[in-house]
Amino acid sequence: MRIQYKNWFMLFVLLCVVVAGLYGISGRLAGNREGAENRKEVWAVSKGKSAAAGGTRGTLKLYAGELSGRATAYHWETAGDQRVLSLLYQKVGDLAEVTWQKKGKGAVYRIRLKKDVMDSDGKLVTADTLLYNYYMRCQASYQGDDEIDGMSIRGLRTYRYGITGKKLRQRVKKVKQEIRKPDKKLRQQAVKELAIPVLYREYYWVKTLYYNKSAQKICDRYPEPVQLFAYYYAPDTSYTGKGKTVKQAVQDIAKQYGTNLEHLAEMTGRDYETKLQGMAIQYFWPDRAAGAGKIQGIQKLDDRTVRIETTGYRESDLPKLQNIYVVTRQCSGNASGEKESGAGKSGRSLPVGTGAYILQEEGKNMLRLQVNSYYHREAVNPTQIVIQNGDLTASRCIRSVCDGTFDMACIWERAEYEKKEISSTMKKGDALWESALLGGLVYHPGRVNTTTISKEAADTGDLGNVIRGLEMN
């Protein structure tokens, strides 16, 4: 009996030794694997690449809404454009603390950058970067959506016209006269560079009325968005837009405006006089297109701080200064987005920014974004985002999420209008027919980690903040 007990005891000890050995080996293997992954990540970041790049697990298939194909850091036309730009760029308000105080009739704004902000080239963003962004938007040649050039910044008019005193007043008078009675060349320039981009954006706004219940009556009168667009924006009331394509209608209406943009200003709530003045300055004095000298009211205080002084205070000035996208390297020297180096496999290039992603490829109806490895993110993926263009209903988006075409789709504009259709589509009951809705965001819970989606961002339509914290399953 004692011998049998001893044999069992020896067998037990032997098993313990074997298990301990296996556990130690597996632990070393796991540790080695983890160390290798860590080294891989460190190496990849040091090379300016993502360690997970190229893997399907890190790729998000996204529908962001309809895209115009003409968006840049300075101009957008659709809600989808804005969402994509929020992934590529950050605004001054995201990167800096802006404080201000009144001074006489004007105000002084102090813009101080956060520490260690880098762009997608891996270069530090400094006060010189801010100067570059503000000066560029003050030039006579600038025709972007921003309105920095319309602010009463001290010394701005001298910078734009390149002269002071009596001659400055003479030039201002000459420009105003030319705008009132433009020649053919200036009129054509105003149509092409100012009226057409603005009208495209307004057309896309008109389209949103067709899924807005409060606008149903007027939309019923004009079954085609082009016709309603003409009703709202054509100065010639006899122009109906009937039988016209969007491009034809936009060009026709833009020609009706020329340099007389008062009706357009009433419709959009924006002042285009400064942009027209800039065109006239370029027309008469081409050497002043990029400004002359320094702007007295824009000063660099230190490596991270810029001071801007205005001679007249307006409540709208603060958001104008905060809401511009920061770019660190220009592609074409203007706001048109014409082709140059800097944006991978696309027909045009976008300026370098500080957003979470960079544009890697642009196809006919597709964008491919690659992670900016210099951007500090909460999540390790998605490392790539493939964005499909289109004008899809909410129900179509849900079906596309369910069948795997998209992992996530933005339906903020349509969520309320298509409420019944959305509810019906999501009640299919098939086990494979799976999707979830948070705010105006449809996603597949099997492919997207639900716990990493910010409810606040989903409720407010902030795609940038949704993506920055997102994890894929």
Residue ranges and their predicted role:
Residues 1-53, 57-63, 72, 406-408, ...:
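Gram-positive cell-envelope targeting signals
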Residues 61-113, 121, 135, 352:
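N-terminal lobe/hinge region of extracytoplasmic solute-binding protein
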Residues 63-86, 315-331, 466-473:
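A structural "hinge/loop" feature
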Residues 64, 360-368, 388-473:
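Extracellular/periplasmic solute-recognition and catalytic clefts
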Residues 65-67, 133, 311-314, 410-416:
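Beta->alpha turn/N-cap motifs
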Residues 78-79, 266-296, 302-305, 309-396:
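Gly/Pro-rich hinge or "lid" segments in bacterial periplasmic/extracellular proteins
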Residues 98-272:
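Aromatic- and charge-enriched surface segment that lines or borders ligand/interaction sites
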Residues 118, 130, 135-143, 313-315, ...:
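Sec-exported extracytoplasmic/periplasmic mature domains
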